[in-house]
């Protein structure tokens, strides 16, 4: 992993690109309760922050989640961290308050577009191709970013396919608790 860190730092250091996107298999902030990814986070997240990465695309955990960074005044800003998958397998996740949006029980893919001072990340349900999440990262002339969270108006899909059992019951309770916290019907 140290070799990967060294390589990533070299690439980010020499990059003068307006938009920086990092792709990782394991997420820096896990959405699975049994995983913390602390080693990965301490290796790579300082680089994400130091070199002004705008978007971190991650996988491995077989669900969807988006987390945004926040500035000193609490305003949403880059980097945006997404965890996504397109596998038929789904995992139980934790509904950590740091995340802005979750999706369970379906598959998701992202479309990233850049137009001038705006990077748009749209996430789609791979089964229906319906828009599921949407974020615009907008940079001013100084390079400071702000976020427009267009996904907050799109209902979260918290689908759970139960075969019965204690694990399934516990996960359904976590879903219900999260929905209550967010005011989701």
Go through each PLM region and give its residues.
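Metal-dependent phosphoesterase/phosphodiesterase active-site architecture
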Residues: 1-22, 28-33, 46-55, 61-185
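Charged helix-capping and loop-helix junction motifs
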Residues: 36-43
């Amino acid at each position: 992993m140290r070799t990967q860190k060294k390589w990533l730092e070299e690439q980010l250091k020499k990059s003068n690109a307006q938009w920086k996107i990092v792709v990782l298999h394991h997420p820096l902030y896990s959405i699975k309760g049994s995983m913390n990814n602390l080693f990965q986070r301490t290796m790579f997240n300082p680089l994400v922050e130091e070199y002004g990465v705008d978007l971190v695309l991650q996988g491995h955990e077989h669900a969807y989640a988006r987390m945004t960074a926040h500035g000193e005044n609490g305003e949403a800003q880059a980097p945006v961290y997404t965890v996504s998958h397109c596998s038929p397998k789904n995992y139980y996740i934790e509904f950590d308050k740091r995340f802005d949006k979750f999706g369970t029980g379906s598959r998701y893919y992202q479309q990233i577009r850049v137009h001038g001072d705006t990077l748009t990340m749209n996430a789609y349900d791979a089964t229906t191709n319906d828009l599921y999440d949407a974020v615009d990262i907008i940079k001013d002339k100084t390079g400071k970013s702000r976020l427009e969270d267009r996904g907050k108006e799109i209902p979260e899909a918290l689908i759970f396919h139960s075969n019965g059992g204690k694990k399934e019951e516990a996960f359904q309770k976590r879903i219900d608790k999260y929905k209550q916290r967010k005011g989701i019907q």
